[in-house]
């Protein structure tokens, strides 16, 4: 049996996991947020995640450190990014190595950016092109994984990417507490959709309003999920996000 573990905020990683699962066949997908350290048995194990601040999301770092997997399982990683890939795959390989786990292959996929805190959505035309490229890359990855082929880490060839990644990633530890800057206006109807869709179960509903519990990943799922656009972050994100 093939297995894929994923972390997703606004859906890019979930799409990749679903698309790859379909191509591989005999594959199950699992949320990384629900992994508690149990041993994973499987023919192959895929780890799918977005790039945050030019590196790994904190939840992925935690997952890799506690990952317990059979010695004969072929392990690969897929990092998707909207801007630049940074050093996410290098980090992934290093953390797994410290944990005594070998990363056999890894891949980069450029997807429509979803970092609503920094920029708006790309045009529909650009998004369609990126999704078309993703579909082709999935076929390539599936063929690669089926024969358990080894490969070197896919890296960015942009100099500015390699320079910026160290500067920006040092701020990743601030993400957990950054949820203190979320606000909710009177348009909130208390539907609880933000809490249900939070990728790390960081939101609880209190008296009909969302309450953030300070282990946020800044994935923007809550903002994207709100049907009334009632959630804002630092008064900067109350706008349509078409992803």
Q: How does the language model describe each region?
A:
Residues 1, 25, 178-180, 208:
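Generic structural motif recognizing short loop/turn segments at the entrances and edges of beta-strands
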Residues 2-4, 8-35, 39-172, 236-241:
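FMN-binding flavodoxin-like domain, especially the glycine-rich phosphate-binding loop
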Residues 40-42, 173-175, 179, 207, ...:
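Residue-level signal for the start and early helices of compact helical domains
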Residues 159-191, 196-199:
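A mid-sequence, solvent-exposed acidic-amphipathic segment
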Residues 183-184, 189, 193-217, 221-238:
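Iron-sulfur cluster-binding cysteine motifs and their immediate structural context
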């Amino acid at each position: 049996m093939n297995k894929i573990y994923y972390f997703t905020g606004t859906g890019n990683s979930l799409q990749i996991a679903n698309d790859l699962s379909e191509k591989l066949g005999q594959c199950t997908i699992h949320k990384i947020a629900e992994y508690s350290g149990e041993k994973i048995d499987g023919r192959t194990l895929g780890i799918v995640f977005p790039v945050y601040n030019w590196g790994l999301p904190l939840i992925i770092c935690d997952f890799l450190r506690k990952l317990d997997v059979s010695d004969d399982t072929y392990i690969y990683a897929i990092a998707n990014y909207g801007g630049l890939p940074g050093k996410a795959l290098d980090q992934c390989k290093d953390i797994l190595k410290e944990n005594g786990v070998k990363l056999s292959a890894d891949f980069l996929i450029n997807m429509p950016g979803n970092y609503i805190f920094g920029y708006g959505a790309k045009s529909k035309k650009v998004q369609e092109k990126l999704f078309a490229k993703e579909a082709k890359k999935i076929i390539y990855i599936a063929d690669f994984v089926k024969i358990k082929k080894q490969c070197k880490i896919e890296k960015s060839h942009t100099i500015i990417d390699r320079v910026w990644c160290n500067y920006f990633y040092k701020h990743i530890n601030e993400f957990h507490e950054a949820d203190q800057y979320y606000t909710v206006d009177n348009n909130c109807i208390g539907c609880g959709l933000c809490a249900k869709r939070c990728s790390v179960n960081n939101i609880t509903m209190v008296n009909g309003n969302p309450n953030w519990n300070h282990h946020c990943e800044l994935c923007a799922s809550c903002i994207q999920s709100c049907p009334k656009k009632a959630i804002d972050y630092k008064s900067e994100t109350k706008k349509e996000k078409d992803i």
